[in-house]
Curated annotation (Swiss-Prot):
InterPro entries: RNaseH-like_sf, YqgF, YqgF/RNaseH-like_dom, YqgF/RNaseH-like_dom_sf. Its main location: cytoplasm. Gene3D superfamilies: YqgF/RNase H-like domain. This is Putative pre-16S rRNA nuclease. Belongs to the YqgF nuclease family. Could be a nuclease involved in processing of the 5'-end of pre-16S rRNA. Disulfide bonds: none annotated. Pfam families: RuvX (PF03652). SUPFAM superfamilies: Ribonuclease H-like.
Length: 156
């Protein structure tokens, strides 16, 4: 069995949630919440996680409007993805993240408000990554095949 390592990112204006998957590529879990400083520091922090986890790909949540169109925040995230692509050597994919933060909040409902604030972004990143992993599994596309495509997909 091949080991799989993919990172999921929930990119917000103040924080970036980071998630990773288990070696089988079946289960995503939160890793860290990066408090945003500036673009260089943000990219360095993500690059650190890519190196630490030996990530083969990065999945970024793309916040579409409820009608499926891309709004200003989605365009900012695509721009962030383009900046990230310049400093890493792994493919980047995007997945629709509509309501992932709402789902994350519900999942953390029993956690104290202070702890929830610290965890919500990484939980949203885990939801984004889990969705990506599940889509590949449902399409009968092994995660490794998806990684081998090495493209930036902005149409999803």
């Amino acid at each position: 069995m091949r080991v799989v390592s993919v990172l999921g990112l929930d990119v917000g204006s103040k924080r970036i949630g980071v998630a990773g998957c288990d070696p089988t590529g079946l289960i995503a879990s939160g890793l860290e919440t990066i408090v945003r400083c500036n673009l260089g520091a943000d990219l360095d922090a993500i690059r650190h996680w890519i190196e630490r986890r030996r990530a083969q790909a990065v999945v970024i949540g793309l916040p579409r409007n409820m009608n499926g169109s891309l709004g200003p925040q989605a365009h900012r995230i695509q721009h962030f993805g383009q900046q990230l692509a310049r400093v890493i050597d792994v493919p980047i994919d995007y997945v629709d993240e509509r309501l992932s933060t709402v789902q994350a909040g519900r999942a953390l409902q029993s956690v104290s408000a202070t702890r929830r604030k610290a965890l919500i972004d990484q939980q949203a990143a885990a939801i984004i990554l889990q969705q990506w992993l599940d889509i590949r599994r449902c399409q009968h596309r092994p995660t490794q095949e998806s990684l081998d495509e090495r493209h930036i997909d902005t149409e999803r």
